[in-house]
Every structure is written in C-alpha cells, then in structure tokens.
C-alpha cells in the first residue's frame, strides 16, 4: 500500500479497478482547510490521462509491474515487433504503447517492456543511447560568444538540440529521460 502523500513520478497504482502511472503530482497546502495531492494519472492500458485529487493519507494498492528485456526487431508500418531475449517469443505493440520511446530506439536495440497481468503496456528505452546525426545545419565559427545550440535530426527521426560544433555523421549520446544531448561519442 502507498499513501497519496508518498506519490512520485512513475509510481504505478490501482484506482477503481484500473491501473494508472503517476505522470505528475503536486502537494497543495491551502491557507484554509486540509492539504491535498493533485495528480495527473495515465491509464496504462488506454493511455488516457486524467487529473485526480486525493487526501495525502488516502492509501492505494501498488500495481505489480513485470519488466522484461526485449529486443526491438522492426516496424511493419502499423505495429512494432519486440522479441523476448530469453524465450525468443515475439510480441507486436501498436504506436500508443511505444510513442515516447520509439524516437530513441534502433532496430536490434534491447529495451525494457513493462507488463501488467501478462499484457504489455509500455516500452522503456535504455537511459542513454548513442545515435548518429543525419541532418543538421552547419555550425560556423564565431556564430555566438557564449556557445549555443541548433536542432539536429538523428537516425531514428528524433530532433535534439545540440551544440554548434556537431555535424552530420557525428555520433552523439542522448539522455532518453529528458531528450537532451550529453556528449559526442
């Protein structure tokens, strides 16, 4: 059991028979009245985001989430196929289950797929990925006095802000939690 006052981003709970992940939360202490916790919850099966308010002492059952290492195989235009690295079982997932992660995933990359009661609901890429820049504007000397950034498209199609010295063909390391450039590899 977890109290609403202990919510953190990423915590998965059961509310009214459905499973939600806490996307955002805020402890509110009004001048008058009791404190409360305002949350944004994402339904893990449907992807719908709702806002709910709870008392900080209200308790919820934590949902048991199974995590499995799986290899991303390919996309057939509609579904994304992943293979369990231990059993070699393949599972297809539609776009709404992979939408946040797919911009950082290349074919054959190993990712974490989350399951609830045997059904896959989310894909988590590695925390740091190395991808090649396929399109960016050339950076010129003297463009700026204090550094700066420019947009760059990587091989998966994601657009990342990178320093001016990054060129097409460079491999860069990206933090998938924030989508930020970390370093040139």
Swiss-Prot record:
Gene Ontology, cellular component aspect: cytoplasm
Subcellular location: Cytoplasm
SUPFAM superfamilies per UniProt: Nucleic acid-binding proteins, Translation proteins SH3-like domain
Keyword Protein biosynthesis tagged: yes
One GO MF term attached to the UniProt entry: translation elongation factor activity
UniProt key word Chaperone: no
Biological process according to GO: peptide biosynthetic process
Domain of life according to the entry: Bacteria
PANTHER family documented for this protein: ELONGATION FACTOR P, ELONGATION FACTOR P (EF-P) FAMILY PROTEIN
Family classification: Belongs to the elongation factor P family.
Function comment: Involved in peptide bond synthesis. Stimulates efficient translation and peptide-bond synthesis on native or reconstituted 70S ribosomes in vitro. Probably functions indirectly by altering the affinity of the ribosome for aminoacyl-tRNA, thus increasing their reactivity as acceptors for peptidyl transferase.
Protein name, UniProt field: Elongation factor P
High-level lineage: Bacteria, Bacillati, Bacillota, Clostridia, Thermoanaerobacterales
Encoding gene, per UniProt annotation: efp
């Amino acid at each position: 059991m977890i109290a609403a006052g202990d919510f953190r981003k990423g915590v998965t709970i059961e509310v009214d028979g459905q499973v939600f992940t806490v996307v955002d939360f805020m402890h509110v202490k009004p001048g008058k009245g009791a404190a409360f916790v305002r949350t944004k919850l994402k339904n893990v099966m449907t992807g719908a985001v709702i806002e709910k308010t709870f008392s900080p002492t209200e308790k919820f059952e934590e949902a048991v989430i199974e995590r499995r290492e799986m290899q991303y195989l390919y996309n057939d235009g509609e579904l994304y196929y992943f293979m369990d690295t231990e059993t070699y079982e393949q599972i297809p997932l539609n776009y709404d289950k992979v939408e946040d992660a797919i911009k950082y995933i290349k074919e054959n990359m190993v990712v974490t797929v989350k399951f609830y009661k045997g059904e896959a609901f989310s894909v988590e890429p590695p925390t740091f990925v190395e991808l090649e820049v396929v399109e960016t504007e050339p950076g010129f000397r003297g463009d700026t006095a204090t550094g700066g950034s420019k947009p760059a498209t990587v091989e998966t199609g994601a657009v990342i802000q990178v320093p001016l010295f990054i060129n097409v063909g460079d491999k860069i390391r990206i933090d998938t939690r924030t989508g930020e450039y970390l370093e040139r590899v």
